[in-house]
Amino acid sequence: MVATILPFAALGEIVGYRRVYIAGLVVFTGASLICALSWSLPTLAIARVLQGLGASGIMCVNTALIRFIYPTRLMGTGMGNNALVVGVAFAVGPTVASGILSVAAWPWLFAVNVPLGVFAIAIALYALPPTPRTKSRFDVVSALLSAVTFGLYVFTLGEAAQGAPRAITLAGLAVLLVCGAWLVRRQLPLRSPMLPIDLYRRPVFALSSLTALCSFAAQGLAFVALPFYFQTTLGRSQVDTGLLMTPWPVVVAILAPIAGRLSDRIAPAVLGGWGMIGLTAGLLLLAFLPAHPSVADIIWRMAICGGGFGFFQSPNLRALMSSAPPERAGGASGIVATSRLTGQATGAALVALCLGLSALHGPRLALEFGAAFAGVASVASFMRLAAGR
């Protein structure tokens, strides 16, 4: 997905965000049907790639559409409502998947997406507004460079974390650096670059992007490490682990809409900064749990993490989108999705590295890394107060 986020976001600025979003829904729904009916592993793999392309089309313009659906004075409310939906999905998704697998075969995990996708397409066709378009041309070379750069970032990071041969890692890193430098150089003279360098010249946007990247790295570290931590270090069962993971997204779903509404009146830098302080504290409290904690000991710590992330997410999205001009909403939305995916990929790779160092103590080390990322995100968030003056 991460390889195509920025190209699809740029395409959205040219043809309209509504078209890209609906096309993403159609591709994702069709690919889900192919997954459910797949007759071989190669067929399933190809269908999963198509699913990723569809999801990329949805994610890259989702935040941009929110900007055009809600008036500026209610943008924080819109971001909060979006975060509510994401939080509920995170909380309910694993339970629904487990329920499906308890009564049906794995293809039904994909088949259930088909009626939901058709329903979503119908709503999108009816409700999504048309958006302004730019007259710029789609830059195919930049799209290829962006796909190679971000795709290689995820690949190289994963290979390095899993102890791949050094030659493979170094070769991937070399190509990544060359393509990345070429991409940046190609974007510099452009008025509406695919990699939104023009937006990074705005201090609030740059700091908001850094805050998002670090926060999602912290989230990625936590969400991948915690199941290992609960099962390997604390000796909890798989069922217990699933239940113990639930408080985080539930609290996010509860608090994110509140934080979004508050961000329409209170500086997002303040809300986001304190939210990341809460996440830092929650991750450290989890990392230093007693040897035999009760369920309540774990739940209230997970709730602190969810509360911190919930108070960060919506205000940061509002700050990031409002710091970009309306005609560059696609580029800003693309950076939102790219920061999320690259941050989560970075976190997952660091967990693999920590587990490679120690299966027993690796999860705790990963949580400490997550707290460090959240701390950096908090500092970057508060720095926006000075940058915005």
Q: Predicted regions: what is each one?
A:
Residues S102-T211, A218, R236, L244, ...:
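Hydrophobic transmembrane-helix bundles of small-molecule transporters
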Residues N62, V85, P165-G172, R191-R389:
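12-transmembrane solute porter fold
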Residues A10-V141:
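Helix-loop-helix hairpins in multi-pass membrane proteins, especially solute transporters
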Residues V2, T29-G30, L53, V114-I121, ...:
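Small-residue-rich packing faces within the transmembrane alpha-helices of Major Facilitator Superfamily
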Residues M1, F28, Q51-G52, M59, ...:
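Structural signature of transmembrane alpha-helices in multi-pass secondary transporters
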Residues V2-A9, P94, A256-G260, A348:
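Conserved kink/hinge residues within transmembrane alpha-helices of Major Facilitator Superfamily
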Residues Y21, F28, L44, F138, ...:
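Hydrophobic alpha-helix/TM-entry signal in multi-pass membrane transporters
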Residues V92-L101, L157, P227, G347-L355:
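Small-residue (Gly/Pro/Ala) motifs that create kinks and tight helix-helix packing interfaces
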